[in-house]
């Protein structure tokens, strides 16, 4: 039996700073905080009342690598749908509650793993913390105190004039103190803003105030490209300093795209084991092959492979051979041909028309050998692919 030694680490190496020490809470079966892996969340876009559509979207999110899912609960009809959704979902469900405190209790009774509360817009929220804490404790439900720049309490807005980092943190710490006064500690906190600079400052400030697990998010981040940049910038700044215990990338895009981006951010910081990664040059005047098309074809051909494999697609002889040698599998193209490398060794030279086919064949061979060595199928699921 042949085993394949790959260049990428099996376990994530240390990040730039040690992980911040926090208490641990449970969101269903998923630990958040302390030494629990950083989880990736998303939120459904279907009407919660459409139970089948919501469960279908949750299944798609689960398949893409989502750890925790949030569903909206703006009405009594939505609240009535929660028990079935919570019971049938493959991953923990969080109910997202605004305005009406009665839906907090409904979500807890429905069996949701957690409830997100927005203290800035739930009527008389502070007066009901004692009852919410008691209900959550009785049902083993955790809470997210979700402070948002767009819905801060009027008193705090008046004090600070706008949603500053200090305003976000003051709101969060106040609500945390109320829960703790009633002996409830199973909560995490978020202080979201649509400006990554303000968001980062708020989380850094909040991290100094207590040992609460922190849910990272840039609110209203925007369309896919803009939102990805904002989230990657903010999350990278915080996670590299050890701040953050669960993340949600907010995009004006299908929820599955949020999971792809979130997983890629964690993998890029070595906070989650890498899977399939495509390394390709940006192309330039030296390129002797259509790198864009080649990279897209290789990416499409390897879709569905869940192996820690780095594949290099290079377009010329300047950096091509070196990059290809550093990868587990790669090609350096030029003069109508492609040199195929496996672990730094040239195994063959093929015509340009056969590059994609050859790379896919070699990747499949490596995957099969890994599957035999591990006693499991390594060619399944959906990879997180980056073409740079």
Curated annotation (Swiss-Prot):
Single GO BP term: terpenoid biosynthetic process
EC supergroup of this enzyme: oxidoreductase
InterPro entries, A to Z: Dihydropteroate_synth-like_sf, IspG_bac, IspG_bac-typ, NO2/SO3_Rdtase_4Fe4S_sf
Domain of life of the organism encoding this protein: Bacteria
Cofactor binding mode and count: Binds 1 [4Fe-4S] cluster.
Cofactor(s), by name: [4Fe-4S] cluster
One Pfam family hit: GcpE
Residues the entry annotates as binding [4Fe-4S] cluster: 281, 284, 316, 323
UniProt keyword terms in alphabetical order: 4Fe-4S, Iron, Iron-sulfur, Isoprene biosynthesis, Metal-binding, Oxidoreductase
Catalyzed chemical reaction(s): (2E)-4-hydroxy-3-methylbut-2-enyl diphosphate + oxidized [flavodoxin] + H2O + 2 H(+) = 2-C-methyl-D-erythritol 2,4-cyclic diphosphate + reduced [flavodoxin]
EC number: 1.17.7.3
Role this protein plays: Converts 2C-methyl-D-erythritol 2,4-cyclodiphosphate (ME-2,4cPP) into 1-hydroxy-2-methyl-2-(E)-butenyl 4-diphosphate.
Protein family: Belongs to the IspG family.
Record-given protein name: 4-hydroxy-3-methylbut-2-en-1-yl diphosphate synthase (flavodoxin)
């Amino acid at each position: 039996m042949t085993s394949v030694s790959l260049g990428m680490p099996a376990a994530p190496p240390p990040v730039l700073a040690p992980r911040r020490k926090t208490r641990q809470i449970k969101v269903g079966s998923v630990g958040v905080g302390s030494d629990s892996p950083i989880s990736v969340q998303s939120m459904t876009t279907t009407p919660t009342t459409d139970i089948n559509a919501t469960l279908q979207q949750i299944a798609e999110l689960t398949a893409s690598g989502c750890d925790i899912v949030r569903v909206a609960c703006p009405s009594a009809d939505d609240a009535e749908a929660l028990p079935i959704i919570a019971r049938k979902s493959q991953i923990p469900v969080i109910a997202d509650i605004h305005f009406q405190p009665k839906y907090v209790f409904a979500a807890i009774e429905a069996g949701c793993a957690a409830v997100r509360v927005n203290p800035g817009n739930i009527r008389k929220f502070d007066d009901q913390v004692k009852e919410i804490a008691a209900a959550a404790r009785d049902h083993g439900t955790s809470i997210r105190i979700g402070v948002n720049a767009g819905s801060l309490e009027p008193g705090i807005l008046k004090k600070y004039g706008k949603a500053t980092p200090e305003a976000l943190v003051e709101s969060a710490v106040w609500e945390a103190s109320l829960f703790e006064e009633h002996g409830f500690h199973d909560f995490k906190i978020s202080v979201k803003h649509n400006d990554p600079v303000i968001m980062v400052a708020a989380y850094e400030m909040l991290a100094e105030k207590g040992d609460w697990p922190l849910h990272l998010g840039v609110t209203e981040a925007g369309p896919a490209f803009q939102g990805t940049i904002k989230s990657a910038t903010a999350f990278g700044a915080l996670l590299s300093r050890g701040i953050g215990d669960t993340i949600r990338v907010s995009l004006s895009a299908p929820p599955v795209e949020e999971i792809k981006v979130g997983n890629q951010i964690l993998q890029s910081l070595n906070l989650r084991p890498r899977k399939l990664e495509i390394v390709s040059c940006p192309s330039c005047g030296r390129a002797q092959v259509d790198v864009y098309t080649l990279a897209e074809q290789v990416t499409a051909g390897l879709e569905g492979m869940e192996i820690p494999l780095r594949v290099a697609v290079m377009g010329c002889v300047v950096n091509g051979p070196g990059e290809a040698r550093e990868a587990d599998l790669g090609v350096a193209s030029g003069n109508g041909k492609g040199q195929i490398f496996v672990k730094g060794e040239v195994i063959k030279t093929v015509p340009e028309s056969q590059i994609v086919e050859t790379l896919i064949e070699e990747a499949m061979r490596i995957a099969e050998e890994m599957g035999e060595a591990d006693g499991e199928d390594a060619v399944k699921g959906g990879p997180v692919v980056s073409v740079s």
